[in-house]
């Protein structure tokens, strides 16, 4: 078994899935609405319910944005399938209208590199101006203007989308919750420097499984890995001395960038005292579009 920073990394793999994502920049005149917009965009990962999930990729200085204001890069994802583009358009409308447009001074710009296609934002977002929307060229881009009660909300007319890789993950077996929090957030922060990835759950406390006695509600708790059930069930897979197992889920624009991100997350997390093992969840190779062995993610 390979060790990183003295912590064993189990010889296993995670499964990841094809997804469709939009990548865009949000800017604002003030840090307060910008932070609120980021929280709104990234809130409530809900692809398991047929909706969307999103996250902040990185923060931008004014010189890095089209309009010279502070901002952030975000990704929003839906499951891949025949109706994925239609679903992505609908979900973008929800998250941007209710999460960004309502925050004062915000603007949205396309940031998708090498897109497979474009969504015309005039329909799902611009038309909430109820006929008062209009387009012109600002910042060398075609922008849709939406008059609002604090001025105008601007969004680029075309937002690109592309196929990516969603659901790569790593598990951190920790001695206690304090170690799990420190290791988990250390991993998430390390990924802020990796272009093209997000962690839609940040530090996830509740990994799930597809098998359930309540199929009407969707995925449920991954009970073999719940430390409080270790002495109550026969199929517990929680070792003695482990009291918390945070999960770091990673979506990225390519398989290579997801693998690189998993390796960086492992390196960062294993620097924390109290991490006793690194592993990953999978479905026996039966569900995912990709199998990602952890050993292939670790940098030599």
Curated annotation (Swiss-Prot):
Q: Kindly list the cysteine pairs connected by disulfide bridges.
A: none
Domain of life assignment: Archaea
Question: Any keyword Transferase?
Answer: yes
UniProt keywords (A-Z) are: Transferase
> SUPFAM superfamilies in the record, alphabetically?
Formylmethanofuran:tetrahydromethanopterin formyltransferase
**Which biological process terms from the Gene Ontology are attached to this UniProt entry?**
one-carbon metabolic process
Q: Which GO terms describe its molecular function?
A: formylmethanofuran-tetrahydromethanopterin N-formyltransferase activity
Q: Which Pfam families match?
A: FTR (PF01913), FTR_C (PF02741)
Q: What InterPro entries does the record point to?
A: ForMFR_H4MPT_ForTrfase, ForMFR_H4MPT_ForTrfase_C, ForMFR_H4MPT_ForTrfase_fd-like, ForMFR_H4MPT_ForTrfase_N
Instruction: Reply yes or no: does the keyword Transferase apply.
Output: yes
- Its family? Belongs to the FTR family.
Q: What is this protein called?
A: Formylmethanofuran--tetrahydromethanopterin formyltransferase-like protein
Q: Which organism is it from?
A: Methanopyrus kandleri (strain AV19 / DSM 6324 / JCM 9639 / NBRC 100938)
Which lineage is the organism of this entry classified under, starting from the top rank? Archaea, Methanobacteriati, Methanobacteriota, Methanomada group, Methanopyri
